[in-house]
Design a protein with these regions (language model features):
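Nucleotide-activated donor-dependent transferases that construct or modify glycoconjugates
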Residues: 1-14, 201, 280
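A short, glycine/small-residue-rich beta-strand->loop->alpha-helix junction that serves as a flexible
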Residues: 7-22, 44, 206-209
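A charged, aromatic-enriched C-terminal amphipathic alpha-helix characteristic of glycosyltransferases
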Residues: 14-15, 328-336, 343-375
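A short, active-site helix/loop in glycosyltransferases that binds the activated sugar's phosphate group
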Residues: 134-175
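Conserved donor-binding/catalytic core segment of Leloir-type glycosyltransferases
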Residues: 190-209, 215-219, 229-230
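Glycosyltransferase donor-sugar binding loop
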Residues: 228-244, 262
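Nucleotide-activated donor-binding/catalytic signature segment of Leloir-type glycosyltransferases, i.e.
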Residues: 242-270, 275
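Nucleotide-sugar-dependent
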Residues: 281-297, 309-311, 315-316
Length: 375
């Protein structure tokens, strides 16, 4: 099949980019022909190795650098252009003989836009992928899903570990298991550990992501062997960058602790993750009970055990022995959980390997893609 992927998010790196790469590579592996549909003058930050089809309707609208006064105008402009892109996509699907369309990152607003355009009457399956439905989003989502239900080729595929937020009366609203993220090379990592044991904390650093309790817990923890912790932070705002550097300076003399203030992209991101033995995720928010955690599924795909807060996709640790849950209520509870997790890995390095192997099998890319395109 020729499968079009409509992408309107411009990102130099991150999970949106890796998700697109995942879809494209798996479609290729299965013998399909993926093509990208993008707005006019779209700047590709990654070479996906596929043809591009340019949509009419204007360029991508970005909020980057916009004042709070300008954002409402940009929001309206984005909605208008989204409808124009969908209208153009309806024509391009026929013009380029596409057999299906995938919109890889959607919200309920995408359904509203769809219903204002000819794309709702597409002659081929159109798949809107939702990366979870939050508790507060459910009513709005289901309202739009009910409106879209009359159009037989519109599929709303929700990546989730739970289906209690969906409705059995809507047969084309389908739960899809989350996929693991793997190295950009497509190679399957192997499980391994080092001495000293290497821990990693990765991702976007913001002021509200308080890492001080973790650092204090690591500083005072009693491990049964040598341990290192790398704290990587990518920062978007100057004040976040200044805070990260100040924290790194304050803790620079802690044995085994190192900091990396950098935005890791592509092979640099892969290497940093592959170099550690386990990943720490001592942060939580209620939304992670409804939205899948891309960082957790990165840890699984890279065969790294994870120490996570209880809110982060609790179904994963319930069903797979890929790490431990961490009480983040105080430095003392973090220290106790960190010691237990690390000492288990030091004393029994293979303790999580079987769980990681099983999770990678169940959350593989083939299963996700089959769930989407087999209608």
């Amino acid at each position: 099949m020729r499968v079009a992927i409509l992408e309107s998010i411009i990102m130099p790196a991150g999970h949106e980019v890796e998700f697109d790469r995942m879809i494209i590579n798996e479609l290729k592996r299965q013998g399909h022909e993926p093509v990208l549909m993008v707005p006019e003058n779209f700047t590709f930050k990654v070479d996906y190795g596929v043809d591009g089809i340019y949509l009419e309707g204007g360029e991508v609208v970005t909020y980057a650098g916009a004042s709070k006064w300008k954002k409402p105008f940009l929001s309206l402009l984005r909605e208008r252009r989204r409808r124009a892109w969908f209208t153009s996509a309806a024509k391009k699907l026929e013009e380029y003989n596409c057999d299906a369309l995938i919109i890889p990152t959607s919200t309920y607003r995408y359904i509203k836009a769809l219903l204002d355009t000819p794309l709702k009457n597409a002659k081929v399956p159109v798949h809107f992928i939702f990366h979870g439905i939050g508790k507060g989003e459910n009513v709005r989502f289901l309202k739009q899903a009910e409106r879209a239900n009359r159009y037989p080729n519109i599929y709303l595929d929700v990546i989730t570990l739970r289906d209690d937020m969906l409705s059995s009366d809507l047969p084309r609203v389908r739960p899809i298991l989350p996929p693991v993220f793997i190295p950009s090379t497509g190679e399957t990592p192997t499980f391994s550990t080092h001495t000293p044991l290497r821990l990693g904390f990765f991702g976007q650093f913001r002021k509200e992501k308080n890492i001080i309790p973790l650092l204090d817990a690591f500083k005072t923890a009693a491990f049964t062997g040598p341990v290192e912790l790398l704290v990587q932070g990518a920062t978007a705002k100057p004040e976040d960058g200044e805070l990260f550097d100040a924290i790194a300076y304050e803790y620079k003399d802690v044995p085994g602790l190192s900091f990396l203030h950098a935005n890791l992209i592509g092979s640099d991101w892969d290497k940093a993750l592959l170099d550690v033995d386990a990943i720490l995720m001592p942060y939580g928010a209620e939304r992670y009970r409804y939205h899948w955690s891309a960082m957790l599924y990165t840890a699984i795909g890279f065969y790294k055990p994870a120490l996570v807060s209880p809110e982060i996709n609790p179904e994963v640790l319930r069903d797979y022995h890929v790490g431990e849950s961490l009480d983040i209520s105080s430095v003392n509870t973090i220290r106790a959980g960190l010691e237990q997790f690390v000492n288990k890995m030091i004393e029994n390095p293979d303790i999580y390997e079987a769980g990681l192997v099983q999770a990678n099998e169940d959350f593989g890319h083939k299963r996700m893609m089959d769930s989407i395109i087999n209608v």
